[in-house]
Every structure is written in structure tokens, then in C-alpha cells.
């Protein structure tokens, strides 16, 4: 299906979604929005899927050969990096190479790894109708190399690794700079919060509604408040 790009980018749609945010408690039943309402002449063909969204179906076969992959999971997590570069002529690039380098197939002696991003596809329409595996199609990716412009000129080139946390960490980094007047170093070192509320892009595409990872040196009152709002808070050394 064709994505409702105009609806997704609509300011009216953004304002409608903001009104649905519960500022007092974690909403484990949060669902995707309906951008089709904000795109003229197009109806949403997936309303039935929205009604049942969040009801995970046990379709994974524990006997799948995929289970042998578990011994390599730690190495798999080192599969993404990022590069930001600019030259004297004003050209700026933001690149985030990825593809699950380990484990993967290397093309002969070239050192070129063949991407295994096809794991990010889903098999069933009700999981994500836009991301069902098909010939000639690329999967939904987590990669988000970014370039922010100010007055039509490059202002910040930025990106990060981290799977489904990439969009979250990049937004927090950007807001730290433009809203809270941090410099690049301060924004990079500031503590982030990562949510696992939505379906994962990897593995069995499961979700952990309410689970958030925070940096363990956050003020205790912040962690206490998050727990009081129904979150499962997981402190870590870095976020």
C-alpha cells in the first residue's frame, strides 16, 4: 500500500496526536494514529487492524532454526556505526552503515558483508501492512542519519546507533541543543530515556509496554516519579 505521507507530515495530525498523550500515567494500550484523516481523498484501509492493535499473537515456533542465532546475539549488537563529515566547500554528510554485520555472510575475500536486514520484515498484514516481506521491497529500517537546516543552510549533522532507540535518542539530542541551549558535547553526554512501548524491529518483533531504560545517575526523584506513573524503569550505566 502507498504510505499516507501528507497525512503523516500534517501539523494538524501532530496536534491531534499530542492531545492523546496521557501526562499522568503510562498508557500501555497506546495505538498508532490515523494519518489518513488528514490526507484528502484517501480512506484508511486498515481500520480493522487498528482495533486489534496490541494483541500479540503467538506465531513464533520455538523449534525454528532461528533459535540457533541466540549464541550470537551479543555480537549482533555491535552491528551499526555512524559517520558525520563536512568539507571546506560546505558539503555535509550523515551516514549510518548497518545491516547486522555479525553474524552475516562475507562476499568472498572482499570484506563486504551482505546485509541481513530482511529480518526486519514481518510475515502478517496485521503486524504491519506496510512492512510485509515481498519481492523487490526493502524492510522498514531503524537507521536515521539526519541533517538539520537553519535558514536553509546545514546546522547540525547527527546520527546514532542503537536499533529502535535511534529516533528517540536523536530527538532528545536535537531538543537538548535547540530548546535547552546545550552545546554538542553537553547534548551528547546528557542522559536519555528509551522506551520499548512499540513493536521491536528485530527478532520476534515483540514489545514491552511500559518498559523504559534510563541512565542510573538520574536524580532519584525522577526515577521515583516515573515508577509512580506505571513505568517499569530499568537503570543502566549509559543510554
Task: For the regions a language model picked out, list residue spans one by one.
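Internal maturation/activation junctions in enzymes
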Residues: 1-98, 107-110, 237
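Proteins synthesized as precursors that undergo proteolytic processing into mature forms
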Residues: 1, 67-238
Amino acid at each position: 500500500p502507498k504510505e499516507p505521507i501528507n497525512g503523516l507530515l500534517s501539523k494538524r495530525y501532530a496536534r491531534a496526536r499530542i492531545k492523546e498523550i496521557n501526562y499522568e500515567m503510562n498508557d500501555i494500550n497506546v495505538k498508532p494514529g490515523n494519518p489518513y484523516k488528514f490526507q484528502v481523498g484517501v480512506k484508511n484501509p486498515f481500520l480493522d487492524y487498528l482495533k486489534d492493535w496490541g494483541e500479540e499473537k503467538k506465531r513464533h515456533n520455538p523449534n525454528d532454526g532461528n533459535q540457533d542465532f541466540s549464541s550470537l546475539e551479543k555480537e549482533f549488537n555491535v552491528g551499526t556505526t555512524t559517520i558525520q563529515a563536512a568539507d571546506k566547500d560546505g558539503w555535509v554528510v550523515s551516514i549510518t552503515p548497518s545491516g547486522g554485520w555479525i553474524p552475516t555472510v562475507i562476499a568472498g575475500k572482499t570484506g563486504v558483508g551482505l546485509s541481513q536486514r530482511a529480518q526486519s520484515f514481518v510475515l502478517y498484514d496485521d503486524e504491519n501492512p506496510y512492512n510485509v516481506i515481498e519481492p523487490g521491497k526493502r524492510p522498514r529500517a531503524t537507521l536515521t542519519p539526519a541533517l538539520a537546516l537553519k535558514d536553509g543552510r546545514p546546522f547540525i549533522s547527527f546520527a546514532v546507533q542503537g536499533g529502535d532507540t535511534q529516533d528517540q535518542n536523536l530527538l532528545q539530542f536535537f531538543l537538548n541543543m535547540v530548546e535547552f541551549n546545550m552545546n554538542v558535547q553537553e547534548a551528547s553526554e546528557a542522559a536519555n530515556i528509551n522506551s520499548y512501548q512499540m513493536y521491536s524491529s528485530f527478532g520476534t518483533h515483540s514489545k514491552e509496554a511500559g518498559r523504559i531504560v534510563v541512565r542510573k545517575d538520574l536524580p532519584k526523584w525522577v526515577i521515583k516519579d516515573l515508577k509512580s506513573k506505571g513505568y517499569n524503569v530499568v537503570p543502566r550505566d549509559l543510554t
